[in-house]
Amino acid sequence: TEMFGIKYPIICGAMMWLCKPPLCAAVSNAGGMGNLTAGNYTTEEEFRGAIRETRRLTDKPFMVNITLLPSIRLTPDHYRMYFKVCAEERVSGIEFSGTPVDKAAGMAAIEGLKKAGVRLFHKVGSVRHAVHAEKVGYDGIYAAGIEEGGHPLNDDVTSMVLVPRIAES
């Protein structure tokens, strides 16, 4: 809440096909953190338009989710485009899920986004991934257990187990 000046410590989960400008803005307007799913957009014009539409619907902060997984229809060119647009539009934050950005796109991508003032978060499903995210320099992590849905890990660790393990590490 302090980092973004939002009223409630609630971040809208990134949901493909659902987290578009109306839902993102509604969550932000209600005091939480809206989350625009980049994967809904395959061109720069569509993606930039969605960010700008969200800004027309709310004057509150919101973030963008970028899922870096080889199993979805997006390519490294899409990821580079998302990074570029997020930096140019100076979105409040990005929630990354899947492959860590430093491994998928290199540290230059992280440095460019941070230089633009974008806060970076990584959604993690294991202690190992949380430790890696901290070492890389993300601004924060989300611990996402198996109940989160759409999880790429094969273990059955819930958030109630994962959060204390990460806090202890």
Labelled PLM ranges:
Residues 1-169:
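Active-site entrance/lid segments in N-terminal catalytic domains of soluble metabolic enzymes
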